[in-house]
Amino acid sequence: MREYTMRGTMAPTEVTRPLVVDDGRFTHGFIIEEMRIWSAGAALPTGFSSNACLSLYDTPPATMNAEESGTIAWSSWIENTTNGIDQFFIIDPEHVINQDLFLHNMGGTAMNYLIRMVPITMTPEQGVLQLVKAVNNNS
């Protein structure tokens, strides 16, 4: 199966970046397989820490809380002289993305990102269900 990647660098002042995946056909979507972030600059004397999340909405969530139902993936990168590098990413596997996606820089630091995804074709009913699920999840 073919894979797609989105990658780039976000400045410390860039809070939200739109990632266009919507091609206008709601029966075409993507499943996020991996989301990685890492430092985009030299580590600070005390280390580097960054948090990011992928969301279906252009407004960043207040926290990295799993109750933010429009958020579908979380990632963190911590680099310091004591513990080396610690990284994690968590992805909600039930989401099929068939609309635009937004990457939120929750750490206020310069970061690189790489998002790996695979395409999926759905029936019209499945596509509508994903759109309805996205709207209902934000309540």
Each model region followed by its residue ranges:
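Beta-strand-centric surfaces of beta-sandwich/beta-rich domains
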Residues: 1-139
